């Protein structure tokens, strides 16, 4: 299975509309975000779990008071349990029901390109930082995917670029250690996330990057 150049594949989740397209090169600009679809030495696809959910982060950025939260109920299913408890603590009225204690904010590892960096140097730096220096890169793949994500909750569009990255560590090397990175709380196998809304399109990304020529 493969994806031809400029062919677009669309996925939709309750929160996102994602366009995936194979391209030749990653543009270099101050706003370029690059991500690595990491494969362990024993063949497992890796994914990161954010320390803070995007929904809670957005709510915090919009608040004018430290004591009052105004929250749309449609956001609640996309937050961590501790974040919901904080919202509940500040509620003047209403209640929070149907909490999912197993929610995780899954993301590909990577980040924003520094203008002085190459694409691969940026990914090496980001992987080192986000794993507390546990991940080292063996080699990168040659296939590049452009990911265009429309966040339906906040009506925003994000563009990123992704390539495969084969690392020197096994899944066991990474799964039994604590991470203290400010953004990432855990690195785990994507195979353990089959019930997540993002699993289908993340699996597709990994399959395209690993199997395409």
Swiss-Prot record:
Catalytic activity line of the entry: a 5'-end (N(7)-methyl 5'-triphosphoguanosine)-guanosine in mRNA + H2O = a 5'-end phospho-guanosine in mRNA + N(7)-methyl-GDP + 2 H(+)
Upregulating conditions: Expressed in the early phase of the viral replicative cycle.
Protein name: mRNA-decapping protein OPG121
PROSITE patterns registered for this protein in UniProt: NUDIX, NUDIX_BOX
Cofactor(s) needed by this chain: Mg(2+); Mn(2+)
Organism annotation: Variola virus (isolate Human/India/Ind3/1967)
InterPro entries listed in its UniProt record: NUDIX_hydrolase-like_dom_sf, NUDIX_hydrolase_dom, Viral_VD9
Gene this chain is encoded by: OPG121
Highest taxon above the source species: Viruses
């Amino acid at each position: 299975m493969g994806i031809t150049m400029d062919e677009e594949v669309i996925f939709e989740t309750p929160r996102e509309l994602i366009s995936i397209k194979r391209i030749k090169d990653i543009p270099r600009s101050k706003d370029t975000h690059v991500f690595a679809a990491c494969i362990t030495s024993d063949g497992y696809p890796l994914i990161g779990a954010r320390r803070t959910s995007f929904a809670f982060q957005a709510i915090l950025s919009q608040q004018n008071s430290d004591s009052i939260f105004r929250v749309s109920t449609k956001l609640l299913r996309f937050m961590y349990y501790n974040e919901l408890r904080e919202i509940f603590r500040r509620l003047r009225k209403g209640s929070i029901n149907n909490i999912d204690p197993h929610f995780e904010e899954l993301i590909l590892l990577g980040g924003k390109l520094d203008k002085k960096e190459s694409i691969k140097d940026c990914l090496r730096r980001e992987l080192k930082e986000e794993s507390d220096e546990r991940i080292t890169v063996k080699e990168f793949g040659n296939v590049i995917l452009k990911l265009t994500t429309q966040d339906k909750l906040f009506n925003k569009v994000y563009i990123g670029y992704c390539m495969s990255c084969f690392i020197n560590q096994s899944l066991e090397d990474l799964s039994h250690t604590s991470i203290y990175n400010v953004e990432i709380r855990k690195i785990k196998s994507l195979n353990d996330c089959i019930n997540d809304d993002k699993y289908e399109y993340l699996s597709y990304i990994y399959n395209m990057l690993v199997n395409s020529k």
